[in-house]
Design a protein with these regions (language model features):
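A structural motif shared across PLP-dependent enzymes of the aminotransferase-like
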Residues: 121-135
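Conserved hydrophobic/aromatic beta-strand scaffold that supports enzyme active sites
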Residues: 5, 15-17, 98-100, 130-132
């Protein structure tokens, strides 16, 4: 399956081959037919990832506070390792899509295979061939 990912450290975008999602309880697997690219929202995400570490810190003081709290709790080196690890994890882009239900998880029986649906939610309704989406999104 193909999915648009962004590398947070460098800001680079890639269309990557990733494993297909499977339905779990409370949601459905959807084969995307279309996904929305927002010139505003996604530009902000892309611009943020392209900033230096200092630029990211200036832009997101809430994350700086989380890092400082982690340093107090866990120490400097474990925090540095956690931050670098998170920066190396690519993130899926997108938050709005439409498609056809392929699989239904337990607790989402109001949907059925073949249903056409609109989906929303960052981290769920991404630019990908297929997505797993909780039933309320």
């Amino acid at each position: 399956m193909r999915q648009v990912l962004q590398h947070v450290r460098s800001g680079a975008l890639e269309v990557a081959d990733v494993p297909e999602p499977s339905s779990s309880s409370g949601g459905v697997t959807v084969r995307n037919v279309a996904s929305l690219i927002s010139a505003g929202t996604e530009k902000v995400t892309i611009d943020f990832a392209g900033k230096s570490l200092l630029g990211k810190a200036k832009e997101r003081p809430d994350l700086v506070r989380q890092v400082l709290d982690k340093v107090r709790k866990d120490g400097l080196m474990p925090t540095v390792q956690a931050v670098l690890s998170r920066l190396d994890q690519p993130i899926p882009l997108g938050y709005s899509c439409a498609g056809v239900v392929e699989e239904v998880g337990r607790g989402a029986e109001e949907f059925g295979p073949g249903d056409r649906v609109a989906c929303a939610g960052m981290g769920y309704a991404s630019h990908a061939s297929k997505v797993f989406v909780p039933k309320n999104l």
